[in-house]
């Protein structure tokens, strides 16, 4: 491949549900997912990308994030690894890190914050 290409992936857009399903298949787990609204996440001051990696609201400053036409790159031969394989390999790598590094994630919600958010969501959703 020669030239300048946009190479965001995947080759076809994935919904959040489909992406999480493929990741779960790759790491051989059955997650229990709770879907909450973007408005709830914003009200709870959950930061896109940092608190919930890969979650980006589709409006405001984030509109169009990672949404590029990649047909030229695909036509030139760009291929993506299967997402389940990438997830499995990433988990394998993560498990090689020292325990203290595994416990200090640089992104994502802490277990305590996740629990609090889910409790807040349950209180709002029950109304």
For each feature predicted by the language model, list its residue ranges:
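Mid/C-terminal beta-alpha module of Rossmann-like enzyme folds, strongest
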Residues: 1-71, 89-91, 98-127
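Catalytic phosphate/metal-binding cores of nucleic-acid and nucleotide-processing enzymes, i.e., regions
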Residues: 86
